[in-house]
Amino acid sequence: MAEGERQPPPDSSEETPPAAQNFVIPKKEIHTVPDMGKWKRSQAYADYIGFILTLNEGVKGKKLSFEYKVSEAVEKLLALLDTLDRWIDETPPVDQPSRFGNKAYRTWYAKLDEEAEGLVAAVVPAHLAAAVPEVAVYLKESVGNSTRIDYGTGHEAAFAAFLCCLCKIGVLRVDDQIAIVFKVFNRYLEVMRKLQKTYRMEPAGSQGVWGLDDFQFLPFIWGSSQLIDHPFLEPRHFVDEKAVNENHKDYMFLECILFITEMKTGPFAEHSNQLWNISAVPSWSKVNQGLIRMYKAECLEKFPVIQHFKFGSLLPIHPVTSG
């Protein structure tokens, strides 16, 4: 149960600015299936899941239109995402025989690869400039794979890790929690959906109809938390087209459902069987708890996803330190 888990604040290092910290370029540490034990015992895993759960608690019962603080750091992150969006417009798909995986994506990605540190430097204050190369790696990892032209939950996790790192160095703070999900992550989703559509990206490691979604997972977790104790919307309503059309602008979960129905044809129960099953769960709190368990089992504990995760000084591979 999410409420019962310890939830370290996302900016637990705020009291001690990491000026003297030795930042490093993150690298892969999970090379074989037996290495997964190292990941599950790591400080990185504890901090990552703690971050996800803290945000889950922060958005509980709140609409996207809820009033919350938007800090300068959040505004700068939105400007960064606007830049990525603009680059898509400047890099149209090329004519090619294959329907999927448009090669223009590689041109778009090469620009990000080149500019990532500059983009992150514009978000991070000058006294934390040493952190930029480390943090920028997670941004580059969060937009898909340029070799395979695919995108999946591992890339989404890299963006959450990027935000977690910004919290750990104090760029984002406790009172940014709601804006992190409703503003920054929501804008990230818009840009990723545009990438997926424009370049016909393949789903990375998709489980087909048996997976939750081809591309995302976190907006279903945070989106179900938003709907906890809703006066009239119940899980059974998200398969109702009218309910989705009338409420998707307020709830991430319903926005995800709308995107799926736009992208897929045929009966919902056939193309999205897992979600169809979830619509039978009686309450949003049960949906939320079940999705957190499923995220751990299907994403965070799966070697094909975690083998690509990178570890540095902010999200370290060493075992959890008590205290």
From Swiss-Prot:
UniProt-annotated binding residues for Mg(2+): 208, 214
Region annotated Disordered, chain positions: 1-21
A single cellular component GO annotation: protein phosphatase type 2A complex
Listed GO biological process terms: mitotic spindle organization
Reaction(s) catalysed by this chain's protein: [protein]-peptidylproline (omega=180) = [protein]-peptidylproline (omega=0)
Coiled coil location: none
Protein EC: 5.2.1.8
ATP-binding listed as a keyword: yes
Domain of life: Eukaryota
Record-listed N-acetylalanine modification sites: 2
Molecular function, one GO term: peptidyl-prolyl cis-trans isomerase activity
Enzyme class: isomerase
Pfam families found in the cross-reference section: PTPA
Subunit (UniProt): Associates with the serine/threonine-protein phosphatase 2A PP2A(D) heterodimeric core enzyme, composed of a 36 kDa catalytic subunit (subunit C) and a 65 kDa constant regulatory subunit (PR65 or subunit A). Interacts with the catalytic subunit PPP2CA (via C-terminus). Interacts with PPP2CB.
The name this protein goes by in its record: Serine/threonine-protein phosphatase 2A activator
Annotated gene: PTPA
